Amino acid sequence: MVKFYDRDISSRLLIGSALYPSPAIMQDAIRDSGAEIVTVSLRRETAGGKAGDQFWSLIRELGVTVLPNTAGCRSVREAVTTAKLARELFATSWIKLEVIADNDTLQPDVVGLVEAAQILIKDGFEVFPYCTEDLSVALRLVDAGCRVIMPWAAPIGSARGITNRDALKLLRDRLPDITLVVDAGLGAPSHAAEAMELGYDAVLLNTAIAKAEDPVAMARAFRLAVDAGRLGYQAGLMGARDFASPSTPVIGTPFWHAVS
């Protein structure tokens, strides 16, 4: 089980609901991923029309917990306003907070992120902030009241995997009591397993599954990878070595030397 504020969740894989080839494939992929938390963009939901109604109906059928996000917001004011609208629409105090600074990298505006988190937490929100792997930013978010931190592995949709392993490991070491979720930049199941092997509590994925040739099969692959990585972490990984170490003990004289 992993703790998200006052809730215990079984699945350590969170999944996004955008970019799938069709609504039916989205639903099948989410179901096969085993995810219990699904992120939803407020802007997509409020687009209206039959397509929006169909989308929301499919999400409800899955019986998952919806985590609305402020994707696309580029200012504190815009993010706070979007979060408040999401709370009314989805009847939840959870919000995945995104404040974007740069259009090319979609890097978070960490200054605006902290400010928006402070405002929302004072207003009763439980904030899931999308941030960089910078420890100082994470500490400020924790000081603001965030109990979940979601650092990126690499830019959104880049599929590059973990680009700053040492920084992510430092976050885990320094924030042992905070729920840490790697969010953005993972492109392969092996990337998810690596994040879990670092001791992260969960990963959030969207593009890597939605844009796969077979999104449903890829959802299953990521599900297994997350479970394998978590089990490996719990089992205790051996440390890397600079030199070889024989796996077979060499004791005494080789048996063939004793043959006359």
UniProtKB/Swiss-Prot annotation:
EC nos: 2.8.1.10
Reactions it catalyzes: [ThiS sulfur-carrier protein]-C-terminal-Gly-aminoethanethioate + 2-iminoacetate + 1-deoxy-D-xylulose 5-phosphate = [ThiS sulfur-carrier protein]-C-terminal Gly-Gly + 2-[(2R,5Z)-2-carboxy-4-methylthiazol-5(2H)-ylidene]ethyl phosphate + 2 H2O + H(+)
Places the protein is found: Cytoplasm
CDD domains: ThiG
Active site (catalytic residues): 96 (schiff-base intermediate with dxp)
Pfam families with a match to the protein in the record: ThiG (PF05690)
Subunit-structure text: Homotetramer. Forms heterodimers with either ThiH or ThiS.
An annotated GO BP: thiamine diphosphate biosynthetic process
GO annotation, cellular component aspect: cytoplasm
Pathway named in the protein's UniProt entry: Cofactor biosynthesis; thiamine diphosphate biosynthesis
Keyword Kinase (UniProt): no
Keywords attached to this entry: Cytoplasm, Schiff base, Thiamine biosynthesis, Transferase
Binding sites annotated in the UniProt record for 1-deoxy-D-xylulose 5-phosphate: 157, 184-185, 206-207
Stored InterPro entries: Aldolase_TIM, Thiazole_synthase_ThiG, ThiG
This protein's encoding gene: thiG
Keyword Transferase: yes
Protein name as it appears in the record: Thiazole synthase
Function comment: Catalyzes the rearrangement of 1-deoxy-D-xylulose 5-phosphate (DXP) to produce the thiazole phosphate moiety of thiamine. Sulfur is provided by the thiocarboxylate moiety of the carrier protein ThiS. In vitro, sulfur can be provided by H(2)S.
Superkingdom of source: Bacteria
Enzyme class, first EC level, given as a word: transferase
Protein family per UniProt: Belongs to the ThiG family.
Molecular function as annotated in GO: thiazole synthase activity
